[in-house]
Amino acid sequence: RGVHANVVRFWPMYPKFIRDKFVEALSKEAMSGKMPRPTDNDWQQCFTRLRDSIVTCACGEETFLTQGEDSFCINCGRKIPKPPVLNCHSGKYDLPLFPGVKLYRCHVDKLSDDYTEVLGEVVRNPNNPGIWGLRNLSDMVWNAETLDGELRSVGKGQIAPVMQIKAIHFPNGLGIIEK
């Protein structure tokens, strides 16, 4: 009767993985102690994944991407084609490579739980906006593996074109680009 109106109204807009996590955490089994509840780390990873799935539609509004398939803007209904994805740490994080998306330390360092420090971003080529790249904002050197298997160093401020590489070797992690 109005108490949970926003929860009910917005529930369908959220990606399935976040809805599933709330159902798991608030299930009868979890609440009674028969099943373990998600840990703080589980929630942190889940909300990082949720943050990673937010993109800005051409209509100017934010929307969620659906993992592994085309998405539709929750505001205007426009189709958003499935972008390439940076699979970090064997699927721990699947980061859609969409202009404006940030790479955080937890994405590039498999031992880190730092979800706030930005170490890279997806940018558009100013001369050709259809070409996207990963800009290294960190002091670490990344090694971009090209489609033919060669390694190319990507230092601070440098950009690795998304469609020309198949992986990025971070000092303490690996990201595979899935197109």
Language-model segment annotations:
Residues 1-41, 45:
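C-terminal lobe helix-coil module of Hanks-type protein kinase domains
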Residues 50, 54-56:
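Conserved helicase/translocase motor-coupling segment
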Residues 56-60, 72-76:
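Short cysteine-rich clusters marking metal-coordination/redox-active sites
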Residues 61-69, 79-82:
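Cys/His-rich microdomains that often coordinate metals
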Residues 82-124:
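N-terminal beta-hairpin/loop module of FHA
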Residues 134-138:
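Asparagine-centered strand-capping/turn motif at beta-strand->loop junctions
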Residues 140-142:
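Short, solvent-exposed loop/linker segments at beta-strand-coil boundaries, enriched for Pro/Gly
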Residues 144-179:
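C-terminal boundary/linker segments immediately following FHA domains
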